[in-house]
Amino acid sequence: MSYSNLKLFSLSSNHELAQKVAKEIGIELGKVSVGAHSDGETVVHIDESVRGDHVFILQSTSDPVNDNLMELLIMMDALRRASAASINIVLPYYGYARQDRKARAREPITSKLVANMLQIAGADRLITFDLHAPQIQGFFNIPVDHLMGSPLIAEYFRRQLVSAGDDIVVVSPDHGGVGRARKLANFLKAPLSIIDKRRPRANVAEIMNIIGDVQGKKCILIDDMIDTAGTITLAANALKELGATEVYASCTHAVLSGPAIERINNSAITKLVVLDTIEMPEERQSEKIVQLSIAHLLADAIIRIHERRPLSPLFELHLPSEQI
């Protein structure tokens, strides 16, 4: 099918994913030049006409967060001034999503500020994945398509563990992730356990109690993101000590900063299954990490939006067999 007035552009943060999405759709990536002045100012130039086109920009606001965010805002401004018919932001990873409320006095709500900036710059629609705080959708006055990674993760584990007859249990690493873990458990028709943790300070977690039976079972931990990997590795080690035969971990966003890789490699985790919402450079790779691609899902979402068809079937998506 021809998509002559549909264009997909990629900036600096996730070019490999954008190429996969373009291939799935059957189009070429749009031509854009991204550079910087000698003083560090970001410069963006669109190298082809976009007049009257429905444009999708794929850019995760991952590390370096501020540079990638500015690239995106500047690109949007250029598209708006170049008379694009619509500007659709594909933001696989929404940076600043953890700053979604005032936890203490005199703190900002930066995720709301980012939402304001995206809308002022000209966004007509946002497509994103597994927001750290789902209520961020309410910060926008434009359509937000909030896609889930759990169907992809569930299909992987269904083929790897469930089909082999393994006795599994899905585990939430904290109370806040129970809803996410319950969805995965429902997909896999597996029981659910919960880890009660107390966090004495930022990026430090202490395991207090495990609710549910994990002895003699293969456990699957799921979280929206893994940053320094303190929470997930402590959880895995605790599950192993309580008699789990194997511990698998999974997340949508593999931030993997600081000591994350070392902690994962030295932990009880057998495999960590992640999605490619964030590019994974060589120094963040490990034999324990399995990366699944969201390209097929994103391509389907873009086509459905362009053709004005519902996105609800995507929440039942099955993983393409070549990724298994």
UniProtKB/Swiss-Prot annotation:
Name the Pfam families on file: Pribosyl_synth, Pribosyltran_N
The record's section on InterPro entries has: PRib_PP_synth_CS, Pribosyltran_N, PRibTrfase_dom, PRTase-like, Rib-P_diPkinase, Rib-P_diPkinase_bac
Q: Where does Mg(2+) 2 bind?
A: D174
The EC code for this enzyme is 2.7.6.1
Indicate which residues the UniProt annotation says bind D-ribose 5-phosphate. Answer: R199, D223, D227, T228, A229, G230, T231
* Location(s), subcellular: Cytoplasm
A GO BP term, please? 5-phosphoribose 1-diphosphate biosynthetic process
The alphabetical list of record keywords is: ATP-binding, Cytoplasm, Kinase, Magnesium, Metal-binding, Nucleotide biosynthesis, Nucleotide-binding, Transferase
Q: In which pathway does it act?
A: Metabolic intermediate biosynthesis; 5-phospho-alpha-D-ribose 1-diphosphate biosynthesis; 5-phospho-alpha-D-ribose 1-diphosphate from D-ribose 5-phosphate (route I): step 1/1
Job of this protein: Involved in the biosynthesis of the central metabolite phospho-alpha-D-ribosyl-1-pyrophosphate (PRPP) via the transfer of pyrophosphoryl group from ATP to 1-hydroxyl of ribose-5-phosphate (Rib-5-P).
What's this protein's family per the entry? Belongs to the ribose-phosphate pyrophosphokinase family. Class I subfamily.
- Binding partners and assembly: Homohexamer.
State the name under which the record lists this protein. Answer: Ribose-phosphate pyrophosphokinase 1
Per the UniProt record, the source organism is Lactococcus lactis subsp. lactis (strain IL1403)
Q: Please state the gene responsible for encoding this protein.
A: prs1
